[in-house]
Amino acid sequence: METVVAFTAIAVSIMIGLAALGTALGFGILGGKFLEAAARQPELAPQLQVKMFIVAGLIDAIAMIGVAVALLFTFANPFLTQVAG
């Protein structure tokens, strides 16, 4: 039983870490491409900014879903009931 809890803690750490890493990379790429496009066509910057914020929200939502699944495994571990019988 302790092994399941330990492996769950490791899995939760990996899930949250990869979600944070993916979000950071996504925001970095998104910001870089936005600045590149705004420098190329400054008159489109307001329209691009709105679209950038929409995509930023979607990128952040994926990380939040990963954190929610990690919290599910932390506090309501479905694997413990299978081991306990």
UniProtKB/Swiss-Prot annotation:
The record marks 60 as: Reversibly protonated during proton transport. Its main location: membrane. Pfam families: ATP-synt_C. GO terms for cellular component: plasma membrane; proton-transporting ATP synthase complex; proton-transporting two-sector ATPase complex, proton-transporting domain. Keywords: ATP synthesis, Cell inner membrane, Cell membrane, CF(0), Hydrogen ion transport, Ion transport, Lipid-binding, Membrane, Transmembrane, Transmembrane helix, Transport. It is found in: Cell inner membrane. GO terms for molecular function: lipid binding; proton-transporting ATP synthase activity, rotational mechanism. The keyword Transport applies. It is a multi-pass membrane protein. The chain crosses the membrane at residues 10-30, 53-73. The keyword Cell membrane applies. F(1)F(0) ATP synthase produces ATP from ADP in the presence of a proton or sodium gradient. F-type ATPases consist of two structural domains, F(1) containing the extramembraneous catalytic core and F(0) containing the membrane proton channel, linked together by a central stalk and a peripheral stalk. During catalysis, ATP synthesis in the catalytic domain of F(1) is coupled via a rotary mechanism of the central stalk subunits to proton translocation. HAMAP family: ATP_synth_c_bact. Belongs to the ATPase C chain family. NCBIfam families: ATP_synt_c, PRK06876.1. F-type ATPases have 2 components, F(1) - the catalytic core - and F(0) - the membrane proton channel. F(1) has five subunits: alpha(3), beta(3), gamma(1), delta(1), epsilon(1). F(0) has three main subunits: a(1), b(2) and c(10-14). The alpha and beta chains form an alternating ring which encloses part of the gamma chain. F(1) is attached to F(0) by a central stalk formed by the gamma and epsilon chains, while a peripheral stalk is formed by the delta and b chains. This is ATP synthase subunit c. It comes from Idiomarina loihiensis (strain ATCC BAA-735 / DSM 15497 / L2-TR). The lineage of its organism: Bacteria, Pseudomonadati, Pseudomonadota, Gammaproteobacteria, Alteromonadales. The gene is atpE.
